[in-house]
From Swiss-Prot:
GO biological process terms held by the UniProt record: amino acid metabolic process; pyridoxal phosphate biosynthetic process; pyridoxine biosynthetic process
UniProt source species: Sulfolobus acidocaldarius (strain ATCC 33909 / DSM 639 / JCM 8929 / NBRC 15157 / NCIMB 11770)
Chain's gene name: pdxS
Disulfide bonds: none
EC number: 4.3.3.6
Taxonomic lineage of the native organism: Archaea, Thermoproteota, Thermoprotei, Sulfolobales, Sulfolobaceae
Pathway where it operates: Cofactor biosynthesis; pyridoxal 5'-phosphate biosynthesis
Protein name (database record): Pyridoxal 5'-phosphate synthase subunit PdxS
Biological function: Catalyzes the formation of pyridoxal 5'-phosphate from ribose 5-phosphate (RBP), glyceraldehyde 3-phosphate (G3P) and ammonia. The ammonia is provided by the PdxT subunit. Can also use ribulose 5-phosphate and dihydroxyacetone phosphate as substrates, resulting from enzyme-catalyzed isomerization of RBP and G3P, respectively.
PANTHER family: PYRIDOXAL 5'-PHOSPHATE SYNTHASE SUBUNIT SNZ1-RELATED
Class of the enzyme per the UniProt entry, highest EC level: lyase
Length: 336
């Protein structure tokens, strides 16, 4: 039996227990216990620890940063975590060449300067960039299509690591394959570095539609879907039981305004990644606070309105129309 299969049985058991607990709470009318006050912390690197960490980020905003100053702005604005890169996605597009993991010295400086979790990106399939970040002590690794893939065919086997991973996905099949590989969090790919939320919207809607379709299928057709997605049938059944992905699903790719963040939360996102939208704008301090406010209060249009008033549209990053991008310029097609 492969390591993937052995590890998957652990996660399957864990999430079925969560599903059963959810049913019990619903049936009895009991209030759920706040996850922010765990009675016993799970051991580092266990399935429970790796999948519990992203749950604590739910409802929050994670911001891309390239230096300590930006990280401090993000923390002061109320971000739940930061993602350290060498360049913001917009600059990755403009500079061309090979985009790699950020300088470990910069990541370490950020870790020593703020109190919120610090994440960092690695290239798809780059096992040793991930090992370096794990040794550095980051809180989560993003195996990201924004960076130049090291392996065009395979992703990292994330079960071998103690640190949790996040991966991008455009649809249910991509999401389930990444979960089967050991991802602890999924995010929409969107089209990073564009300031254009349309692709993130499309990917979230595709995910929602494919989940609802899967739920309505008879068992025989769900078996076919498992083969199509190249994942165990038990993982497909877990999605059906939970009526959602079994792990946290954030929105990312082109989010630039408070209204963008609220829109993605309304579509069912568990939280928000903001890349170039904050620090390629001319009002990063206010915009960071406004996006956090809108994401946390997306159900209240009046508060989202106040958040939108905190920024100026003429200070927003210059967006890119997706239709003007050549096929080879699309980042979302990397890593399927």
């Amino acid at each position: 039996m492969r390591l993937y299969d052995l590890s998957f049985y652990e996660i399957e058991k864990f999430f079925y227990k969560l599903a059963e607990l959810k049913d019990i709470i619903s049936d009895t009318g009991l209030l759920s216990i706040s996850p922010s006050i765990p009675q016993t912390l799970p051991a580092q690197g266990t399935v429970m620890a790796k999948h519990a960490f992203p749950i604590f980020q739910k409802g929050g905003v994670i911001m891309d940063v390239t230096n300590v100053t930006q990280a401090e702005i993000a923390e002061n604005a109320g971000a739940v975590a930061v993602m350290v890169l060498d360049k913001l996605p917009y600059d990755v597009r403009k500079s061309g060449g090979v985009a790699r993991m950020a300088d470990p010295k910069i990541i370490e400086e950020v870790m020593n300067s703020i109190t919120i979790p610090v994440m960092a990106k690695v290239r798809i399939g780059h096992y040793y960039e991930a090992r370096v970040l794990e040794a550095l002590g980051v809180d989560m690794i993003d195996e990201s299509e924004v960076l130049t893939p090291a392996d065009e065919e395979h992703h990292i086997n994330k079960w071998e690591f103690k640190v949790p991973f996040v991966n991008g996905a455009r649809n249910l099949g991509e999401a389930l394959r990444r979960i089967y590989e050991g991802a602890s969090m999924i995010r929409t790919k969107g089209e990073a570095g564009t300031g254009n939320v349309s692709e993130a919207v499309k990917h979230m809607k595709i995910m929602n539609y494919e989940i609802s379709t899967l739920i309505s299928l008879p068992e025989e057709d769900r078996l076919k879907k498992a083969r199509e997605y190249q994942v165990p049938y038990q993982l497909v059944e877990l999605v059906v039981k939970l009526k959602r992905l079994p792990i946290v699903n954030f929105a990312a790719g082109g989010i630039a305004t408070p209204a963008d963040a609220a829109l993605m939360m309304w579509l069912g996102s568990d939280g928000i990644f903001v890349g170039s939208g904050i620090f390629k704008s001319q009002d990063p301090d206010q915009r960071a606070k406004a996006v956090v406010l809108a994401a946390a209060n997306w159900e209240d249009p009046e508060i989202v309105l106040e958040a939108q008033k905190m920024i100026s549209e003429n200070k927003s990053m210059m967006g890119i129309d997706i239709k003007t991008l050549k096929p080879e310029e699309l980042l979302q097609v990397r890593g399927v």
